[in-house]
Amino acid sequence: MADKDKSKDKEEKSIKIQETFLKERKVFLWGEVSDKSARDVTEKLLYLEMDAPGKEITFYINTPGGSITAGMAVYDTMKLISSPIKVVVTGMAASMGSILLCGADKGKRFLYPHSRVLIHQPLISG
């Protein structure tokens, strides 16, 4: 029973942390760009735009890349909203992650000192 209580407390603390970051207009993409992660990021960007249009959003990314269509949904949302987006790479922005980094305007793209960016030729099948 004690393990369940600890698990519940940990989950509640995690939710509280996420809410705090969202109030500070900070959005995170950790891991692969997928339909699920893109939906999460897109929903948060649209919510923050609705909450305070034109106020800066900080978008932290650490991703090896992933789905082109999911990533382009995030990219298009970044370009659609009026809020300026500052992108901060905290580990890696590879493949689609590098495209998301490029989605920020000039002067709004940042990397932590040990971060890496990987840009490669597009992969076309068929």
Question: Where are the regions that the model predicts?
Answer:
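Terminal-region recognition feature
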Residues: M1-G126
